[in-house]
Structure formats: C-alpha cells, structure tokens
A protein has these predicted regions:
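Small-residue-rich hydrophobic transmembrane alpha-helices
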Residues: 48-108, 145-164, 271-335, 368-382, ...
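Transmembrane helical elements of multi-pass membrane transporters/channels
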Residues: 16-35, 137, 171, 200-204, ...
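Residue-level signal for short hydrophobic patches within transmembrane helices
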Residues: 7, 11-30, 34, 57-64, ...
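Helix-terminus/linker motif at the lipid-water interface of multi-pass membrane proteins
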Residues: 30-49, 118-125, 181-188, 248-277, ...
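Short runs within selected transmembrane alpha-helices of multi-pass transporters and secretion channels
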Residues: 69, 137-156, 164-172, 193-208, ...
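Hydrophobic transmembrane alpha-helices of multi-pass small-molecule transporters
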Residues: 60-63, 175-179, 205-209, 281-284, ...
Length: 453
C-alpha cells in the first residue's frame, strides 16, 4: 500500500516507512555476506580475498545504476507530493529509457574490461584466478540489479517500502540456500557462490517488476509508444546523473582504497573483506533511515510543507545519533567475536587487523549517520549537486589520506582516513544548510529547472 508522508505524526510516519527499508537492507547484507562467510569458512583466505575484492568492484558498478534509480526516485517523490499524475507518468517513462540504456552499456563494458581489472586493483597473482572466475559470472547479474532497484525506487517514492522488502527477503533466503548447496554440497567453489548470487538477483528483479506493474497504474505508462518529451529527459538527467555521480564517486573512492589494501597482501585483504561486511551491517540502518528521510522530505517539499520538513529533520538527527552511539559501543566491544564469524580462530593476523579496523571505524559511526541524512536532504530539495560535493570531500579526503598515511604508519593509516573524511563532509554540509536553509526548503518549479541545467 502506498503511504502519503505529507500527513500524520512526523516521526511515526518516517519511522514506520523506514522500518521495512531497514529490514530489507539487513536482508541485503545477509545476501551479500553469505558469499563472504561461506567462502571464508569453507574455501580459505585466498578465496575470501577474491570475493572481498570482487564485492568492492561490483559495488562500484551497481552504484551507477543505484544512483540513477535514487535520483529518479527523488523526483518521483516530489511529483507524488504535488499530486501531479501526468508529470509522474512522464518521469517514469523517461527515467526507464535512460537507465535501461546505461545498464546495457555498463554490462557490455564490464565484460569487455574484464582482464584490465587485475592491474587496476593490484590483485595478487594467487588471488586473481578465483576473483576472475567470480566476477565473470556476477557481471551477468547487472541487468537484474537494474530491474530490482528501478522498481523498488518507484515503489518507495510513492510510500510503499513493504513490497521491495518481500522480494529482497525471498532472494536473500534463496541466495543463502544456493550458496550452501553450490559451494559445500556440489563443490563448485567461488563460481558456485557467484552463480547463487546471480540466480537470486534475477528472482528478485523479475518478481518486483511483475508485482509493481500490476499494483501501480502509473507504471503502465511504460507500455506507451508516444514520444518522450526532451524536457522530461533533461529533468530526469538533472536528478539522476548527479545522484549517479555521487554514488559512483563514493564507490570509486572505495575501489581505489581497495587497490591500496590489496597491495598489503592476502591477509590484509581478507581482514578488510570481513571487517567491511561487519561495518556495513553496523551502519546500514542509518543509511536506510537516511533514504527514508529523503523520501519524507521530497514528498513534503513537493507539497510545500516547510514546517513539517523542519520537524522531520530535527527528529531524524536525534534518532540517527542515538542509534550510532549504541552501535559504536557494541562494535567496539564485540569486534573480535564478530571477526570470528568470518574466519577461523587460527587466522590471528587476519583477526587482529580486522579488530583494529573495527575499533577505529566503529568509534565514529555518528559521522556517517549524519552524512547519510545530509545526502538525503540535499537530494530531496533539488540540490543533488550538493550531495556530490559532500561525497567528493568525504571520499577525496579518504583516498588522499589513505595513500599519505599508509606510507607513514602502514595499513592503519587507511583505516584512519575514513572517519576524517566523514567529519569534514559533515561540517561542510551543516554549514551550507544553516547559510541557505530558508531558500533550500522553499519549493518551486524553478528549483527543478535549475537542477536540469
């Protein structure tokens, strides 16, 4: 059922809308972590390093599609808040054509550049064989990623966060079951883990597409053969491409750091692969809360409800900070037991490095929690370019400091670069908000047109 976030109690509306998104991403992390956990436990540290590096690469590639879908979703939310049915349908058609074209191009490039990845990511020879086998299969799932994220973004934009959760749950359970069967039962190795992921992706992508087309009459506009107005393409591009740039820059920075991590050898690669999964579980709820917050802001922005936006912002900051403080304490205390979920107790070097990473990152989750809210805010009020600026500051700082500090203090310097980047981006985003807040929260069609240009 679609939910109108422009009415009802502010925090209750936001939290109830966010809950299925958080549960869905928990399942997504289970989905992503299944390969890592099963491979690490049953195939060893070299295979774990291969899958971990592959995950960073796939996150970068799919972030392009995710950014396009998120940007389109922000515009869908604004049109839904305006009750502009015609503009919403036209935006749906324009965005689908644009993102489908990018998906097909990206898929072709991914396969064409397969053998260039080894040198770009500085993958050790003993890891590359498993990594190549894994990514050659998971690249086939890029189209399924487009299907799921496009239709999930539309459903969330109009207030339906339950249907995406259902299909994610189905695919997560299927992925874990197939992982166990392919890797342990059939001894397919890393190729089995990759195959399990791709099958699960297509089940969720095709399933949510069929359901959305049945439930949402606006999506039937996709069947129309009437010309797509150039103004709608520009409007969608203005939102989607900037959000795509934000997501891509974010994950390109992570990919560059992955290359630096790889230069320290298989043990550090394996520690990073496991710790990043734990990290993602820890701050994932505030990431999804930030996305729910963005939909809330966008609907109310389109409806012109500035006071409701202000109340939502204050409440969202409080919820995010309280959650991050609690999770930081838990990760700090239980860092070693968490690492033992992914690696055997005898792998002392891997465990020690993973614990060091979690103690540094985990102490500063408030920084990333606030940053997710800032990303969501600027995306929702027709300022996606500001989200790009914050991402460049955060990731630019991270990459530069990672290379500088690691040359002086070793791999620990890479870990310290992350929270420093969060802090600088937070300060920039907050200062910009307080300088421009009156203009930011005032909706007008001219705001959307400025985004196009």
């Amino acid at each position: 059922m679609n939910k109108d976030l422009t009415r009802g109690p502010v925090m209750r509306s936001m939290l109830w809308f966010a809950l299925p998104m958080i549960l869905g991403n928990l399942l997504q992390q289970c989905y992503n972590s299944a390969d890592t956990l099963i491979v690490g436990r049953f195939l060893g540290k070299t295979a774990l390093a291969a899958v971990g590096s592959s995950f960073s690469l796939m996150t970068f590639l799919t972030s392009i599609l995710l950014g396009l879908c998120m940007g389109s979703g922000a515009l869908f939310s604004i049109r839904f808040g305006q009750r502009d049915e015609t503009a919403l349908k036209e935006s749906v058609r324009a965005s689908f054509v644009l993102i489908l074209g990018v998906t097909l191009l990206l898929n072709g490039l991914a396969f064409a550049c397969l053998d260039l990845i080894k040198s770009f990511l500085q993958v050790p020879d003993d890891v590359w064989g498993d990594m190549r086998a894994y990514i050659a299969i998971v690249f086939a799932g890029i189209f399924a990623t487009f299907l799921y994220n496009y239709f999930a973004s539309y459903l969330r934009a109009v207030g339906n966060s339950v249907v995406p959760l259902v299909f994610l749950a189905v695919s997560a359970v299927l992925n874990i079951a197939l992982d166990l069967w392919f890797v342990i039962g059939l001894n397919f190795g890393v190729a089995g883990a990759a195959g399990a992921t791709v099958i699960a992706q297509y089940v969720s992508g095709i399933g949510i597409m069929i359901c959305a087309l049945i439930k949402c009459p606006q999506l039937r506009a996709l069947r129309s053969r009437s010309p797509i107005h150039a103004s709608r393409i520009r409007e969608i591009a203005g939102y989607s491409i900037l959000t795509c740039v934000q997501q891509s820059v974010m994950n390109l920075g992570i990919l560059m750091v992955q290359g630096l991590v790889n230069s320290f050898g298989a043990a550090v690669m394996a520690a990073f692969a496991a710790a990043v999964k734990i990290d993602a579980f820890a701050y994932m709820p505030v990431q999804d809360f930030g996305n729910a917050f963005s939909t809330f802001i966008a609907q109310n922005y389109g409806a012109g409800k500035q006071e409701r936006i202000r109340k939502g912002l204050k409440g969202a900051v409080l919820v995010s900070v309280v959650f991050c403080v609690i999770v930081s304490a838990l990760v700090f205390v239980f860092a070693k037991p968490l690492m033992l979920l992914f690696v055997e107790a005898g792998e002392t070097e891997i465990i020690a490095e993973g614990v060091r990473y979690l103690h540094i990152e985990g102490a500063f989750y408030c920084g990333i929690g606030c940053l997710f809210l800032l990303y969501g805010l600027y995306r929702a009020v027709a300022k996606p370019g500001m989200s790009v600026v914050l991402t460049v500051i955060s990731l630019g700082t991270r990459v530069v400091l990672a290379y500088l500090l690691s040359a002086v203090i070793g791999v620990t310097g890479i870990w310290w670069s992350v929270p420093i980047g969060w802090f600088l981006a937070d300060v920039t985003g907050v200062v910009y908000y307080f300088i421009h807040k009156e203009k930011l929260l005032h909706f007008g069609e001219s705001n959307l047109k400025r985004t196009e240009s």
